[in-house]
């Protein structure tokens, strides 16, 4: 049985039982608040147990995306739940390769010398990888071409993202995440890199390689902020390396967050 069929079938079953009891006059109060409460409970149970009960449905798809002569690339990652692991390597004529548990939907386009890739979880997938539980969840494990200038956009939901971009040529990095943990090693040889992060109730950790300067601007609500002020002293409302304006390799970081933790080191 497919995960979606089981989940939505359970929802319809509960609604039908409540309507039957209402019709038989077994209760006279407004059952809709009860219905939505039960729906939330079922959804919670589903998120906790669904991936374990239906692991047989999970497939591992091996994907390679060729550069096709492109000299730079934009990649958007739409990863709703689970774990995403990113590193880099010598891939020759390929932009990336990797393993995508749960399948992958991709859209590839080319404009001049630039390649654009939009990578998403399949729409049929429903589930969440829970930290600390021993199952693969919806795991993406991929390698990026270390020698191609990149613009990356990560849109993630619940789960964990571990992004080792230290040996890449990432020029622009955007991270948008919800209730998750995100750890990023920033580029050490990309020249200037612009980083924009927006987070809800999330943990964000950015590691700036030694020899790379940084400027950090924060717009945070109730988050806990931890910035290495020995490397990035506070000047006014900005944390900045003393040599930021003249550094050959530098990262310009702007973070907007609600609740959670921000760590830049």
Language-model regions: role of each:
Residues 1-265:
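Alpha-helical transmembrane segments and their membrane-interface anchoring/capping motifs
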